[in-house]
Amino acid sequence: MSFDLCTIDWTAIGSIVTFVAMIIAYWTIHISDKQNKSNQRLQLLLVQRDIEQKRLDELVENIMIINDSMQPIVVTDYSVKLINGIFTEDDRHFIDEMAANDLANNNRLSVQLIKYDRKESAKKVLMTLSNMRRKYGEWIRNLSILNLYKSSFVISPQDLNRMILTMVQISKEIAPEYKKDIDYVIKTKDNDLNKAINLMNIFCYVISTYLNEQKKIFEEELYAFVKEEQKRIDNIVFHDSIK
């Protein structure tokens, strides 16, 4: 078979070649566009993961600051010092510093509760911590008030009475088994200062025991929460990128 170049329709062949070239060009652009979109999605997922990781790290850091500030041994030691009349000026300054830190921790905790109000797993951990901090804060305030009243009588009897009522309420709430001992102190004919000192003896033990028990529960809850959150964050890129 022989071909006559003059009889070949070069225009038709040129159209076919152009069409094929257009298909190749379109496919190349399509693949490139798909890769670009995939890369963009990957970048967005990486940014999302970094943001989530920073949020978790910030939350855990704030939680640990608050948790570490509440030491049961401190509650016992400084209460015993005050009860036994060996509370020094340095001790007073230390308690004042603790009170300032507790106020800062309360504000820090309030911010975290606002941020995680809609996230139940985080909120559960924060509420456990909040309950501990509230009772620990009451101990700090009561110890400060009792020291002021004992050393200089600079607070009113009404404030002293409110402090007594607070210690009674919290002690019975946490450790109802001490109700009989608490009622015995209240019914004695001692003055309010001596009643408050005797109640502090019970109150400090109740608070320190409560903190020891709650810290174990809290730390288990925190560990479980962080484990699940970290797993979720680590899977952001892997699971979402293959969808």
Features from the language model and the residues they span:
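Amphipathic, membrane-active segments
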Residues: 37-91
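Structured catalytic/translocation cores of nucleotide/phosphate-coupled proteins
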Residues: 15, 22, 57, 239-243
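An amphipathic alpha-helical interaction surface
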Residues: 97-243
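Intrinsically disordered, low-complexity regions of eukaryotic proteins
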Residues: 6, 11, 93, 98-99, ...
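Membrane-embedded hydrophobic alpha-helical segments
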Residues: 1-46
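Short, solvent-exposed segments of well-ordered alpha helices
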Residues: 7, 39, 43-61, 119, ...
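Intrinsically disordered, low-complexity serine/threonine-rich segments
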Residues: 18-24, 72, 154-164
